[in-house]
C-alpha cells in the first residue's frame, strides 16, 4: 500500500540522511572520494529511487525497468548507497569502496549489474541517457530514463550537443536533473546559483525546465510528476543544492571537493551532525517494500536471419563506403536490433541506404560526433546493435567517448569513411591518419580495414 504524502516525505528525508551517512562513512574508510558531492544530491537520490523509479533491485536488467545514469560519476558512493538501501546488496559492502578487489570503484562501471555505462568522464552520461531513451522507443516500452548531472559538468560541450539532440528528437521519456551546488573542484561553477540563467539555457535548447529547491523533498516529487506529464520534449530539473549539505563545517565551502573526512574527530563530528537529522516517521514506513517493480516479461531472443552474400559481378566497381551502406541495410533486414546513427554525412557514408528501409531505426545526430557515440553506448547497453558512422577523421572528436565505450564494454560498431589519405584533394583536415592508433589503443577493440567492396560486406 502506498504511503500518503505526509508519511512519505519524512520517510524519504530519513533515507536521504542514511545515504549521506553511508557516503561519508564509505569514503572515509577508503581514504578518498567525494562525500560533499554526494551530500548535495542525497535528497534527489532518495526521492528518485524510493518514490519515482520503477525497478527491481534483484533484476536490474528488466527490459521495462526505468533507467538511471549517474553522469556526475564522482558521486558514485551515493549511487552504491541507494542500491544498498534498496536491498541490492548488503550495506556492509559499502565499506569496501575503492578497494582493489571490490566492484565498488571510485566511479561506476558496468562491472555492477545496475550500471548501464561507465561514467566519471564528465559530460557523457546525458549522451548515453539519450541512447537509453531512444531504445525505449525501439522496443515500444514505456520505461523512462533519468540522468543526474553536476552543474560544473554542464560546462562540457557534449552536454549541449545532447541538449540539442534530445529536444529535436522530442524525448519526453527523458528526465535530467542538474545538482546545482554551485561549487566545482577548484572554484565556484560558471553560473553559481543563478537558477534562472541556467533554466533559460535549457529552455532555449527546447527542454521543459523546472527550478526547485533540491533539498525540499516535496518539491522534488512534484517536479518528477510534472516531468512525467510533459509531452513532446525532455525535462530538465534544476535543483538548487548545497555542497556538503547536512554537515555544518563543510556546507557550501570551497576546498572540500574530493576530500574524504579524516577518521577521528573530523569524521565523528560529521557523523554526529548527520545522526541528529533523522525525523519522526510513521511506523512501518518501509520504502524498500514500496518500490514499484515493472512487470516481468520474457526477454526477447532474437533469431537473426542469414545475411545475403555480396552479389557483385566480375569487373564491377564499388567504393568501400557504398558497400558499407549496402551491407548495413542487409544487416538491418537480418536483425531488428541493428540501428544506425549518423552525423550529417549519410549520403557520403551511404548509411542512408539503411535509413530508406528502416527509418524508425535510423538516428540523425547532425554534426555532433560526441553525442552520436554516447547515444550509441546507451543503445548498446540496452540491447541494440548500433552502427554510428561518419568520416573516419571526425571519429577522433569523440575519442574520450570511445575510450569510455571500451571501459563500458558495450558492443558498438563504428564505421569511418574516407580513410587515410584517400581524400587527398580535400586537404589534411579531412584525412584520417590518427584514428587507427586511437582505436588500437582501446582494449578488446577489433579494427578492420577492408580493401574492397566484398571485404567490406563480409
Set out the residue ranges of the language-model regions.
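Glycine-rich ThDP/TPP pyrophosphate-binding loop and its adjacent helix/strand module
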Residues: 55-61, 65-67, 103-281, 441-458
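Thiamine diphosphate
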Residues: 1-146, 268-269, 281-458
Amino acid at each position: 500500500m502506498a504511503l500518503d504524502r505526509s508519511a512519505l516525505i519524512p520517510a524519504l528525508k530519513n533515507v536521504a540522511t542514511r545515504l549521506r551517512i553511508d557516503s561519508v562513512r564509505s569514503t572515509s574508510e577508503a581514504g578518498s572520494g567525494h562525500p560533499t558531492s554526494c551530500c548535495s544530491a542525497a535528497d534527489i537520490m532518495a526521492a528518485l529511487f524510493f518514490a519515482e523509479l520503477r525497478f527491481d533491485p534483484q533484476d536490474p536488467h528488466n527490459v521495462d525497468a526505468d533507467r538511471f545514469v549517474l553522469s556526475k560519476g564522482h558521486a558514485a558512493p551515493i549511487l552504491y548507497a541507494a542500491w544498498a538501501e534498496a536491498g541490492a546488496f548488503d550495506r556492509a559492502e559499502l565499506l569496501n569502496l575503492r578497494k582493489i578487489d571490490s566492484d565498488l570503484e571510485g566511479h561506476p562501471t558496468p562491472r555492477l549489474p545496475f550500471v548501464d555505462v561507465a561514467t566519471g568522464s564528465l559530460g557523457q552520461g546525458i549522451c548515453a541517457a539519450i541512447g537509453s531513451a531512444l531504445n525505449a522507443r525501439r522496443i515500444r516500452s514505456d520505461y523512462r530514463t533519468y540522468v543526474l548531472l553536476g552543474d560544473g559538468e554542464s560546462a562540457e560541450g557534449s552536454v549541449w550537443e545532447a541538449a540539442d539532440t534530445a529536444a529535436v528528437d522530442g524525448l519526453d521519456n527523458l528526465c535530467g536533473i542538474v545538482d546545482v551546488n554551485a561549487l566545482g573542484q577548484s572554484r565556484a561553477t560558471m553560473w553559481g546559483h543563478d537558477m534562472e540563467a541556467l533554466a533559460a539555457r535549457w529552455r532555449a535548447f527546447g527542454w521543459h525546465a523546472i527550478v526547485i529547491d533540491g533539498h525540499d523533498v516535496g518539491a522534488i516529487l512534484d517536479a518528477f510528476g510534472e516531468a512525467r506529464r510533459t509531452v513532446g520534449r525532455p525535462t530538465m530539473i534544476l535543483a538548487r543544492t548545497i555542497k556538503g549539505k547536512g554537515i555544518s563545517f563543510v556546507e557550501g565551502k570551497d576546498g572540500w571537493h574530493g576530500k574524504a573526512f579524516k577518521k577521528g574527530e573530523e569524521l565523528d563530528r560529521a557523523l554526529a551532525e548527520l545522526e541528529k537529522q533523522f525525523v519522526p516517521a510513521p511506523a512501518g514506513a518501509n520504502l524498500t517494500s514500496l518500490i514499484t517493480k515493472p512487470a516481468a516479461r520474457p526477454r526477447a531472443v532474437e533469431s537473426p536471419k542469414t545475411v545475403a552474400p555480396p552479389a557483385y559481378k566480375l569487373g564491377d566497381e564499388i567504393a568501400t563506403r557504398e558497400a558499407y551502406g549496402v551491407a548495413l541495410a542487409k544487416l538491418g533486414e537480418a536483425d531488428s536490433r541493428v540501428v544506425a546513427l549518423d552525423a550529417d554525412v549519410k549520403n557520403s557514408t551511404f548509411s542512408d541506404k539503411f535509413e530508406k528501409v528502416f527509418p524508425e531505426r535510423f538516428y540523425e545526430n547532425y554534426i555532433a560526433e560526441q553525442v552520436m557515440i554516447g547515444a550509441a553506448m546507451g543503445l548498446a547497453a540496452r540491447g541494440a546493435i548500433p552502427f554510428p558512422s561518419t568520416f573516419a577523421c571526425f571519429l577522433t572528436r569523440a575519442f574520450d567517448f570511445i575510450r569510455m565505450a571500451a571501459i563500458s564494454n558495450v558492443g558498438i560498431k563504428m564505421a569511418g569513411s574516407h580513410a587515410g589519405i584517400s581524400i587527398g584533394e580535400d586537404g589534411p583536415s579531412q584525412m584520417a591518419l590518427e584514428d587507427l592508433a586511437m582505436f588500437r589503443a582501446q582494449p578488446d577493440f577489433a579494427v578492420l580495414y577492408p580493401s574492397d567492396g566484398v571485404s567490406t560486406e563480409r
